[in-house]
Amino acid sequence: MRESLHIQGGQCGNQIGAKFWEVVCAEHGIDPTGRYGGDSELQLERINVYYNEASCGRFVRRAVLMDLEPGTMDSVRSGPYGQIFRPDNFVFGQSGAGNNWAKGHYTEGAELIDSVLDVVRKEAENCDCLQGFQVCHSLGGGTGSGMGTLLISKIREEYPDRMMLTFSVFPSPKVSDTVVEPYNATLSVHQLVENADESMVLDNEALYDICFRTLKLTTPSFGDLNHLISATMSGVTCCLRFPGQLNSDLRKLAVNLIPFPRLHFFMVGFAPLASRGSQQYRALSVPELTQQMWDSKNMMCAADPRHGRYLTASAMFRGKMSTKEVDEQMINVQNKNSSYFVEWIPHNVKSTVCDIPPTGLRMASTFIGNSTSIQEMFRRVSEQFTAMFRRKAFLHWYTGEGMDEMEFTEAESNMNDLVSEYQQYQDATADEDEYEEEEEEEEFAQHDM
């Protein structure tokens, strides 16, 4: 079995994670006590991807929960599905990281990290063939960003050949929870560029917009936002868990989506968008799904794909549908919007079809795109970072935990390099002369010296 080990860190990560597990439990017919009450053999066929079967016939999740304060975990534990986590897999401190990346990465988090790694090791040893790790965290706070990236780099050392997928919630453009978000996010991206294989970029503001505009919710709660995220998360892994006509896994996804190793930050979308209470009453068709899925208003991060070009994209359909129709729709999208795809990667949209739809829907689709427009997001965070860093504002909180200013400078330049790499490939064309390329190579050689 190709198991996937789920790790959630910090308040945001734990809340998203809890929602995600509700969705997965519903899909596999697992009730809040961990017993199977479903109606289809297929639900049990590959249940091992996310669950361990305990001796008494109960299913226990392959999940590790960590935080530097007990609050969020207590609410997860007392939540509707809190009973199916292994009690030993809750690892928490008492002091909190206080939105300080350095506390999460160097001081408080570093003290707790070994206990987290012990749990991760124990879970990994329980797997027949571990495919990889998925980490939920936010980049604006202290624990999810600081300790989350610390854990990712430690896991990277210990399991270098396993896939590392992150669901990372970026700071929003207009809505800010904490002043030091730009610092925390930039320091985290600096780590993610090096240590993650695939990062799904999420953003509260874009999720709010979807709730207002598409779902017509007047006062969306974090619960509604997390519901959207969990639908996408479940879509990304559905091929591991259910049989399909065209399968994919985390590794195939990476091979098809990442043309250059540093450019592994993806935009995600989901269709059909329905609010939590209302199941949609109209039957959906593949063309409708495709249209909604590629719609820029559907993207869960605050970047507009129309401002850049897609390097690659992947569409994951779920439900009973004809693969021929899926292929036709995909070709159709690429032909109609050819200017939004780079022409130097032919056939750059991968599609997968999984037979089992999500609970309560006849068909659904998840979209993952590697678009150069995501640089808007990095650029925005980078500008805010520079504005504060020039004045050395709030820096004493970080240096007081033993950080060096040099690390900030490195993180800043790494983020700026990332932005310019995206820009470079956005502007690249297929028929540039080899002569130009040689010139560029020479420039790079001089640059590196």
Curated annotation (Swiss-Prot):
SUPFAM superfamilies: Tubulin C-terminal domain-like (SSF55307), Tubulin nucleotide-binding domain-like (SSF52490). The lineage of its organism: Eukaryota, Viridiplantae, Streptophyta, Embryophyta, Tracheophyta. Its cofactor is Mg(2+). Keywords: Cytoplasm, Cytoskeleton, GTP-binding, Magnesium, Metal-binding, Microtubule, Nucleotide-binding. One of its GO terms (biological process) is mitotic cell cycle. Residues 426-449 are annotated as: Disordered. Dimer of alpha and beta chains. A typical microtubule is a hollow water-filled tube with an outer diameter of 25 nm and an inner diameter of 15 nM. Alpha-beta heterodimers associate head-to-tail to form protofilaments running lengthwise along the microtubule wall with the beta-tubulin subunit facing the microtubule plus end conferring a structural polarity. Microtubules usually have 13 protofilaments but different protofilament numbers can be found in some organisms and specialized cells. This is Tubulin beta-2 chain. The keyword Coiled coil does not apply. Tubulin is the major constituent of microtubules, a cylinder consisting of laterally associated linear protofilaments composed of alpha- and beta-tubulin heterodimers. Microtubules grow by the addition of GTP-tubulin dimers to the microtubule end, where a stabilizing cap forms. Below the cap, tubulin dimers are in GDP-bound state, owing to GTPase activity of alpha-tubulin. GTP binds at Q11, E69, S138, G142, T143, G144, N204, N226. GO terms for cellular component: cytoplasm; microtubule. One of its GO terms (molecular function) is GTPase activity. Residues 429-443 have a biased composition (Acidic residues). Belongs to the tubulin family. SMART domains: Tubulin, Tubulin_C. Mg(2+) binds at E69. PANTHER family: TUBULIN (PTHR11588).
